[in-house]
Every structure is written in C-alpha cells, then in structure tokens.
Amino acid sequence: MFGMLSSSFEDDPFFSDSFIAHRESMRQMMRSFSEPFGRDMLSISDRRGRARNRMGHEDEENSLTHTDVSPFQAMDRMMLNMRNSMQELQRNFGHLSMDPNGHSFSSSSVMTYSKVGDEPPKVFQASTQTRRAPGGIKETRKALRDSDSGLEKMAVGHHLHDRAHVIKKSKNNKTGDEEVNQEFINMNECDAHAFDDEWQNEILKYQPRGQWRNLDNSRMRSVAHENSGSRELKRREKHHQSPAIEHGRRSNVFVDKLNIKGSPVKINKK
C-alpha cells in the first residue's frame, strides 16, 4: 500500500534513498505482523476442514475456501483505485500547468506512523509543493522527516525558465550532523545574487495590490499597539513591570516579522 502512494516520490532524487529504505522497513514490519496470523489462520482452517470432512460437509468446505480472502486484499484494492484516480488527476493537472500564461499550484504528501511494543513511535513524512506563474516563474518546496533515522531535510528552488537556484538543508537529529548545499542550474555561483533579485522582481509583478495596503495597515496597527503598550507600561511599571515588558517584547517581535522578504528557508530544531 505504501509503495502505491510513494512511487512518485521515489522517482525524485531528493526523496528516493530515504523512501527505498523506509519501504523496506515497512515490508519487514508488515511481514512480521502477517506471518504469525497467517500460521494461526491456516491451523484453524485445517482443524475445521478435518472436522467438516468427518461430518461429510464437503460443499460447505469448498464454499468457505472460495470466499476466504486475505484481510489486506480489500485495502489493497481500495488503495489501487485511489492511486488510479490520483494519477488521472495529476495528468489533467499536468496539462494545465504547462500553460505559460496560467497560475498553478500542486501539492503532494505522504505520512506513515508505526509503533511496536515499548519502542518509540516511528513517523515518516514527505511533502512536495510546486507553484507556477506566467513568465517561466516557478517555486518548488520539498521536505522530509524520518524519525527512525533522525533525518530532516528540505529544499527550496527558484526557477526562471531554464535557470534555477536551489538551496538544500539537512540535519540528522541522532548524529547532530548538519549540511547546507546550493545547486545552480544553467548559471554560475557568482550570478546567484542577481538571479535572486530578478526572481523577486518577477514575483512582485503578480502580487495583489491590496496586499501592500494590508501590509501597511498591519504595520500601523502594530505601531499603535506598541504605543498603547508603552503607555500601559508607564502606568503599571510599579506594580506589574514584568508582564508589561513581556507585552512590549511581543509587539516588537510582530513588527520585525513584517520586514521579512522572499521565501525563507527554515529548519525546525528540536
């Protein structure tokens, strides 16, 4: 079942190694679950079959044999139908995303959770997103987290026609190793800064005008909130100094967040 959902991720070099290792781990776990049940079910069937043979109910035995279905087969059929529907949807979306004058957004994700006995739970997550805009503009985001291996990584790519700048970050929470790599497609490393500026300028052409007014209003509201917090601080600093200072800090943090530009790359540290 997992292989059906993850086939598209396995074709991507960013995900392939982790997905292959995780799929093998899932197969071993499912095999350990199914084999004991399979032996028990076979032994029960044998005992029942011998009893029915002694009683002479051969027809009933044959009908039971024909209707005996693995408990996983029904789920497999359901997942196969779901996969076929998703593939058809992706094909239709692929035709739309090829329109050079259109906007499009696509997103795919998969997650597995397993827990055996007293062992800590194992969580595997992967997601990919693609945004497109006219003029050959594209942004890609990929992320993966594997609690079993401790690996967390993500990649953000900015594309203009056949040029691209991709930043990849990874961290292993078990070993503490961290790595940052940059990939330059059809350009040199020295051109990265100019390319990033060009990409940002192209994106600004498609920003809704109201977004800038909303941003200005947000700044004004935060400044007014900060001023009122300052007055409140003066009135209460003798009796409630710590809460007032914390209130002012929250206002300053909110104002600082408004100055963020572009598409930042973050790694969640635990």
UniProtKB/Swiss-Prot annotation:
Describe how it is modified after translation. Phosphorylation is required for binding to YWHAZ.
What sections of the sequence does the record tag as coiled-coil? Answer: none
Protein name in the entry = Myeloid leukemia factor 1
Q: Which domain of life is it from?
A: Eukaryota
Could you list this entry's UniProt keywords, alphabetically sorted: Cell cycle, Cell projection, Cytoplasm, Cytoskeleton, Developmental protein, Differentiation, DNA-binding, Nucleus, Phosphoprotein
Which GO terms fall under biological process for this protein?
DNA-templated transcription; myeloid progenitor cell differentiation; regulation of cell cycle G1/S phase transition; regulation of DNA-templated transcription
- Main localisation: cytoplasm
In the record, Phosphoserine modifications are located at: 6, 8, 32, 34
Q: Which organism is it from?
A: Bos taurus
Function field:
Involved in lineage commitment of primary hemopoietic progenitors by restricting erythroid formation and enhancing myeloid formation. Interferes with erythropoietin-induced erythroid terminal differentiation by preventing cells from exiting the cell cycle through suppression of CDKN1B/p27Kip1 levels. Suppresses COP1 activity via CSN3 which activates p53 and induces cell cycle arrest. Binds DNA and affects the expression of a number of genes so may function as a transcription factor in the nucleus.
Q: Name one GO cellular component term.
A: cytoplasm
One of the entry's Gene Ontology molecular-function terms is: DNA binding
Stretch list, region Disordered: 127-148, 221-247
- Region entry Interaction with COPS3: which residue ranges? 50-125
According to its UniProt record, where is this protein located? Cytoplasm; Nucleus; Cell projection, Cilium; Cytoplasm, Cytoskeleton, Cilium basal body
Q: Where is the signal peptide?
A: none
Q: Which family does it belong to?
A: Belongs to the MLF family.
Compositional bias (Basic and acidic residues): 138-148
Q: Name one Pfam family in it.
A: Mlf1IP
How does this polypeptide assemble, per the annotation?
A: Interacts with CENPU. Also interacts with NRBP1/MADM, YWHAZ/14-3-3-zeta and HNRPUL2/MANP. NRBP1 recruits a serine kinase which phosphorylates both itself and MLF1. Phosphorylated MLF1 then binds to YWHAZ and is retained in the cytoplasm. Retained in the nucleus by binding to HNRPUL2. Binds to COPS3/CSN3 which is required for suppression of COP1 and activation of p53.
The keyword NAD is assigned to this record: no
